[in-house]
């Protein structure tokens, strides 16, 4: 009897849910239609706003070209791409209106332009309008201690919405890797959209790190020790990679900065027909006046590291390798060696990392041989590179490595990480001659530094010449040609 009652209750429950199916379907359909109507209405309003903004004083419509670069005043390699891209477009489309969306609200537009000239020696030939965004904190990694990728990506949508509400461009280019803004500007703003990808937000390498339960700057130790948490994170990464691929595929033009980035973007976005490699512009010409022969202004050798103070740059590895080099006395007495870190700090988190690096050098007893130069002018950077014997780079799977190219152009012998762009595109043989060195572990770096310093001056000069000859393909001029060719589709 009880079994019969349970069966009757189950049938009744199924009939109840079945009766709700069609009404639920109608409600969902109605809500979807309403959402489409609202979004379409917003799009129409934005189109009217666009026409008002793009009309000049003489009544003619002007094309509005906007770059989304929330950290345009940071002074890194990504910012050099931004300013060179703007300069190239202004040469070809001088009548257009140029806009940069930025979150650098603590400075004004003139100060940003002066900073670009001071750091990169770039001065634009036409005016640029800056749209200052107040919600940049939504894309700060410090706001999301967990689910950082998802948090920053969702935050970029709100930041993109703020940008779109202030200015609706004809052409939108994301030059900083915020792919989740692409569908917003394409389908709501009605813009032609392009993207320059420095580094995929997620990559198959990141999936491998979690799958193999390896510790990394983006994979905490407590997760690697727990198989269940590792599986949960792996599922989260796969879902995020799928969504990242969907939003990235909205781009009408995709530019990537290296072979390594190309392989990952083709795998994730699957838009090979509109994806091209556009090597980032490196100010090769500026460094060519540095003599290749070794200067002996001061005794000993100078080692330099050029790059922003971000966790993925792995600066601690350089200090540990340097300490190992000194402690094992692989080279001459310590006073003859000095390691100088040169880079930009974007925010308080970067400043905190610099302080942590200072403490690490103190803990290892090498603080008197290590210096930090923060946000220094371009001329000062050039002076350091002119005196350096070795340039250090330790980022695993660096997307490209503008700092690596600058070191090679300046005549510094580069010692880079054996992965990513440096391995595939930069530190490669030129006409059969080596152009630099690659390493991975702390021991590798220490031994290779010792090997370079033990070479004769003539051998080092030969490597310098080959390296300098090889980097002409990364010049500003080459960038302008390939960039303009790639974005041409956006202006048709």
Curated annotation (Swiss-Prot):
It is an enzyme of class 2 (transferase). SUPFAM superfamilies: UDP-Glycosyltransferase/glycogen phosphorylase. The keyword Endoplasmic reticulum applies. Residues 234-254, 400-420 dip into the membrane without crossing it. Residues 41-233, 255-399, 421-492 are cytoplasmic. GO terms for cellular component: endoplasmic reticulum membrane. Residues 1-19 are lumenal. It is found in: Endoplasmic reticulum membrane. Pathway: Protein modification; protein glycosylation. GO terms for biological process: dolichol-linked oligosaccharide biosynthetic process; protein N-linked glycosylation. It is a single-pass membrane protein. It catalyses: an alpha-D-Man-(1->3)-[alpha-D-Man-(1->6)]-beta-D-Man-(1->4)-beta-D-GlcNAc-(1->4)-alpha-D-GlcNAc-diphospho-di-trans,poly-cis-dolichol + 2 GDP-alpha-D-mannose = an alpha-D-Man-(1->2)-alpha-D-Man-(1->2)-alpha-D-Man-(1->3)-[alpha-D-Man-(1->6)]-beta-D-Man-(1->4)-beta-D-GlcNAc-(1->4)-alpha-D-GlcNAc-diphospho-di-trans,poly-cis-dolichol + 2 GDP + 2 H(+). Belongs to the glycosyltransferase group 1 family. Glycosyltransferase 4 subfamily. This is GDP-Man:Man(3)GlcNAc(2)-PP-Dol alpha-1,2-mannosyltransferase. It comes from Pongo abelii. The gene is ALG11.
